[in-house]
């Protein structure tokens, strides 16, 4: 409204393994006649109020990029919907806009088929996906046990089971994040920053005139969050080593 733009839909985004507050988003969308597409690239595998991500709105998209909870060895992704019409259109768009006949294109489409090798890898990984989610929870619990008195650790509401795409901590205000990251790098501990430049500061969105004051929490988090190593096969010894180095830097 502020920028005289007619909103037609909402793209909700799961982050670090947790879905967005989908009940509130769906309620708002229904009241305002909007569609909802959920970006579950980082939250695939998680649950929200005993419902699996992928079943929470009109359409859910996910990514099979290697860094995601269910990752292939290359690029890939999928859509989830209970709407037969949307599913039919998506299948058509995936293959050049194809209609019922192979050489009859009924809409503008693309080449977006998942290649056979990635599909085979995903089928094998899907068989162990639930177990890997449980292992990620064990890793997260150990990190939290080690670090909850020294940094701000992730908060997970009781009605959410996270897929722990990342384990992201908030550093104390007096800590220089670049120095912290360089210190861990010197100890052969990789880290990642998601995301140093918020969406409203990206060039394509500057035309919307969003002030820093309006999104001051976003700005603060973009400068203070950092993600520690996270995958299902981190053992306790490694987690404790990483945790001890985090504690050592912050205390000293």
Go through the PLM ranges and name each one.
Residues 74-75, 117:
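A conserved catalytic-core signature of glycosyltransferases
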Residues 1-72, 78-80:
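Active-site phosphate-binding strand-loop segment of PLP-dependent enzymes
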Residues 1-3, 9-13, 18-24, 31, ...:
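PLP-dependent aminotransferase class I/II
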């Amino acid at each position: 409204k502020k920028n005289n733009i007619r909103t037609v839909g909402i793209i909700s985004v799961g982050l670090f393994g947790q879905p967005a507050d989908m009940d509130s988003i769906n309620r708002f969308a229904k009241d305002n006649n909007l569609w909802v597409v959920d970006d579950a690239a980082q939250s695939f595998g998680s649950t929200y109020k005993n419902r699996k991500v992928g079943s929470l709105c009109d359409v859910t998209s996910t990514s099979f990029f290697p860094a995601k909870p269910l990752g292939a060895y290359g690029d890939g992704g999928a859509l989830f919907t209970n709407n037969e019409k949307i599913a039919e259109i998506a299948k058509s768009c995936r293959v050049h806009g194809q209609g019922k006949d192979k050489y009859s294109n009924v809409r503008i489409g693309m080449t977006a088929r998942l290649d056979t090798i990635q599909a085979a890898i995903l089928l094998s990984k899907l068989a162990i996906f639930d177990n890997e989610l449980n292992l990620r929870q064990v890793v997260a619990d150990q990190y939290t046990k080690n670090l909850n008195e020294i940094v701000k650790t992730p908060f997970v509401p009781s009605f959410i089971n996270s897929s722990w795409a990342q384990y992201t901590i908030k550093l104390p205000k007096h800590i220089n994040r670049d120095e912290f990251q360089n210190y861990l790098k010197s100890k052969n501990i990789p880290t990642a920053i998601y995301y140093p430049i918020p969406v409203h500061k990206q060039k394509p969105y500057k035309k919307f005139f969003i002030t820093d004051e309006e999104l001051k929490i976003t700005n603060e988090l973009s400068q203070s969050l950092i993600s520690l190593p996270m995958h299902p096969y981190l053992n306790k010894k490694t987690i404790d080593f990483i945790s001890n180095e985090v504690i050592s830097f912050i205390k000293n």
